């Protein structure tokens, strides 16, 4: 049911989107990026915001043509064939692997706050993941309030990090490569850092596209909001990168989370605030939010037939315990097997980027298929430029996938390939079994296209 009341304007979308984009990734991955590129990490994260915007080009292109009230689900349904629908559905489950990265990062920060936990990080991560999954049983209202509070604390922590750290950076040498600290790994290292930091820089489109149903003039507001969010995030992350890479020597920050730099720049009280309120709070909030947001996509996967019918089961309150239990098992697998945080991120990002390649290239067909909507697009650009952006978007997604893959260990690379193969095999298998019927998917696609066209026409009439 569509929400009633005052609709969101541009600044509402910017606020929501920026809050959603600034998340856990920058806390836990900045040190891995520094390991590849040294002090040029500031350029990596600033450029990375625009690079990842291109990698998610379809999230900017499609909302400029249509009012997509179903967000990401509607966009993918509109462009996917039956096989890719299955791959995307199974990918929803595989994304559970990424949930473990939050728990691993949380354990790292807890070990900083409570040093006696240093040798028990795997146990802490396992217990944390279990408790967070149990918390989903009680619903999301309290968690949503908590997330809003923690977001304010997070923004305050990052602002303090930049404010206290920027004065301790030696700008005379920060952007110099004389000591090998700037562009530490050369161009290859820069691109590898760009790929690793993609996880932290990819969130600029997620929140805005999910809000189309409650946004005023969404065809204009959402694309414009995404562009502004990306610019602001590039400035914030760039400033953080200057501090994280420029205060301490490379050897002390490479591969470490930013609490190492925070300890060097903050008084003890503010350092504790940064670790607990910023690090632990942000990670916990992100994990709770991610688990809550997965409820309906997971149910959709089960209800569409991609999973056996047992996974449709819910308790008397509607809690989908069967599918959440499966998701939990997937989420704790990297923890109990001891996979590294950067490997976990890579193994989820690689198939995600492969799906993005498909989506970005599929956008090439939209102007011809929907000439009326193309003529009324909110981002006025010539067709040749739009086509270049589609191809560039696929290229950027491919660059991220390739660079993440090449930097994996042999065992992690095999696991990443296995994930992609299993996604494809399960999609084909369920279609051949008739558990999911291609004609049903086609009907759903037609309905979503009709609804998108109708909503777009209604929005244009209202705006006129």
Language model: regions and residue ranges:
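Membrane-interface "cap" regions at the ends of multi-pass membrane proteins
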Residues: 1-39, 52-53, 57, 69, ...
């Amino acid at each position: 049911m569509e929400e009633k009341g005052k609709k969101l304007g541009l600044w509402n979308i910017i606020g929501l989107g920026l809050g959603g984009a600034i998340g856990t990734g920058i806390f836990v991955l900045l040190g891995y990026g520094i390991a590849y590129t040294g002090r040029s990490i500031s350029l990596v994260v600033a450029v990375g915001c625009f690079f990842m915007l291109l990698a998610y080009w379809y999230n900017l292109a499609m909302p400029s043509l249509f009012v997509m009230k179903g967000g990401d689900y509607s966009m993918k349904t509109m462009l996917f064939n039956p096989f890719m629908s299955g791959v995307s559905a199974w990918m929803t489950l595989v994304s559970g692997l990424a949930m473990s990265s939050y728990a691993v990062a949380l354990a790292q920060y807890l070990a900083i706050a409570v040093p006696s936990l240093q040798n028990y990080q795997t146990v802490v991560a396992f217990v944390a993941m279990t408790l967070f999954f149990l918390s989903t049983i009680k619903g999301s209202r309290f968690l949503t309030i908590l997330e809003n509070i923690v977001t304010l604390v997070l923004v305050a922590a990052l602002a303090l990090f930049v404010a206290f750290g920027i004065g301790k950076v030696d700008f005379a040498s920060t952007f110099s490569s004389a000591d090998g600290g700037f562009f530490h790994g050369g161009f290859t290292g820069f691109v590898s850092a760009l790929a690793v930091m993609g996880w932290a820089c990819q969130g600029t489109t997620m929140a805005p596209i999910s809000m189309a149903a409650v946004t005023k003039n969404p065809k204009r507001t959402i694309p414009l909001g995404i562009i502004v969010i990306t610019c602001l995030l590039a400035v914030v992350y760039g400033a953080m990168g200057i501090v994280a890479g420029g205060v301490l020597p490379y050897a002390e920050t490479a591969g470490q989370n930013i609490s190492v730099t925070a300890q060097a720049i903050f008084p003890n009280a503010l350092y504790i605030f940064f670790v607990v309120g910023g690090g632990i709070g942000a990670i916990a909030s992100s994990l709770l939010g991610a688990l809550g947001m997965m409820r309906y996509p997971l149910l959709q996967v089960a209800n569409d037939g991609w999973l056996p019918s047992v996974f449709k089961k819910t308790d008397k309150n509607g809690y989908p315990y069967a599918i959440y239990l499966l998701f939990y098992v997937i989420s704790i697998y990297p923890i109990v097997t001891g996979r590294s945080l950067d490997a976990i991120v890579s193994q989820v990002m690689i198939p995600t980027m492969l799906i993005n390649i498909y989506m970005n290239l599929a956008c090439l067909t939209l102007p011809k298929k929907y000439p009326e909507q193309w003529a009324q697009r909110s981002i006025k650009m010539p067709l040749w430029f739009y086509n270049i952006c589609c191809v560039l978007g696929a290229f950027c997604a491919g660059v991220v996938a390739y660079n993440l893959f090449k930097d994996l260990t042999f065992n992690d690379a095999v696991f990443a390939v296995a994930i992609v193969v299993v996604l494809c095999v399960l999609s084909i298998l369920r279609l051949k079994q008739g558990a999911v019927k291609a004609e049903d998917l086609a009907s759903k696609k037609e309905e979503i296209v009709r609804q998108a066209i109708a909503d777009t026409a209604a929005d244009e009439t209202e705006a006129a």
